[in-house]
Amino acid sequence: MVEPYSQQKQIQQVVYRILDANLDRAREGLRIIEEWCRFGLNSGQLAGECKYLRQEVAVWHTEELRAARDTAGDPGTDLSHPQEEQRSSIKALLQANFCRVEEALRVLEEYGKLYHPKMGQACKQMRYRVYSLETNLMGHQRHQLLRRSRLYLVTSPSESLLPTVEAALKGGLTLLQYRDKDTDDFVRLELATKLRQLCHSYGALFIINDRVDLALAVDADGVHLGQQDMPIATARQLLGPQRLIGRSTTNADEMQKAIAEGADYIGVGPVYETPTKIGKAAAGLGYVSYAAQHSSVPWFAIGGIDANNINDVIDAGAERVAVVRSLMQAEQPTLVTQYLISQLNRIKPES
């Protein structure tokens, strides 16, 4: 049945309004992402990709589509959701705007087929480019924060786990690893979810010890693997390129192997004997000095480091340290965090 001409025109105007609104939405979302790539990440490559996509979207924003706009008569302008009223972190802001762009492009892909034979395919291709951009940007963001992080807290089981972690985050901690070898998976999943939410609310990275499956389940920023854990290549296949993978190392051979296999960062130690590594001899400050001269990836000295010996570790060449007991057992985790970071910040930051 052929629709009357007047009805066809009415439907056409509705389609034009849908296209106009979603073209605006896609361009606005891309611009918000572009600004962070440009000013927050100082990445000309990522900002350039955003700009290219924004201009590709603009090609389809014709005068006849703009002319169909009816903001005053749009009931959607009064609709809102509480999640739209706040953003807890840069990551949340970026994810919200990536979703906005991707959804808009999906709408444009479908309704665009009614407007121009090539518009649907063009928007489909752009949508896949936005997916790739999101993966690259979030990975870039994580790597930048990893490089900026000086202090790394590795947790141990504690009844005050969450308050201690939050106190450290208040002190400026930007990197946390959840390590728990004994708790059952149900409790571990619950705690990991809460820790991830807590870390991300403070703009900190959240890493899971050993368990790639748990890291994926709670959307962690990465995983830390011991020498006896799965190969880095296997973990990378499961986690993808955007998440971080760390590896513990105790000597030069293990360090070089971890770097060659694609570790994003390494642990160097134990510097001193520690009860968290029972039966393992200390690697000593000599290994710290070796790592300072030979590691091509970010590395963290770890093992028995506290406020009393951190300057010895720094003097040996460490720019980053990981701690367990000195924070998990601290009476005032915020103050201890601030002190440790202040000592590490005396070192010239990595460019």
UniProtKB/Swiss-Prot annotation:
Residues 130-351 are annotated as: Thiamine-phosphate synthase. Belongs to the thiamine-phosphate synthase family. Residues 1-129 are annotated as: Unknown. It catalyses: 2-[(2R,5Z)-2-carboxy-4-methylthiazol-5(2H)-ylidene]ethyl phosphate + 4-amino-2-methyl-5-(diphosphooxymethyl)pyrimidine + 2 H(+) = thiamine phosphate + CO2 + diphosphate; 2-(2-carboxy-4-methylthiazol-5-yl)ethyl phosphate + 4-amino-2-methyl-5-(diphosphooxymethyl)pyrimidine + 2 H(+) = thiamine phosphate + CO2 + diphosphate; 4-methyl-5-(2-phosphooxyethyl)-thiazole + 4-amino-2-methyl-5-(diphosphooxymethyl)pyrimidine + H(+) = thiamine phosphate + diphosphate. GO terms for cellular component: cytoplasm. HAMAP family: TMP_synthase, TMP_synthase_cyanobact. This is Thiamine-phosphate synthase. PANTHER family: THIAMINE-PHOSPHATE PYROPHOSPHORYLASE, THIAMINE-PHOSPHATE SYNTHASE. The gene is thiE. Its EC number is 2.5.1.3. It is an enzyme of class 2 (transferase). Pfam families: ThiD2 (PF17792), TMP-TENI (PF02581). Keywords: Magnesium, Metal-binding, Thiamine biosynthesis, Transferase. GO terms for biological process: thiamine biosynthetic process; thiamine diphosphate biosynthetic process.
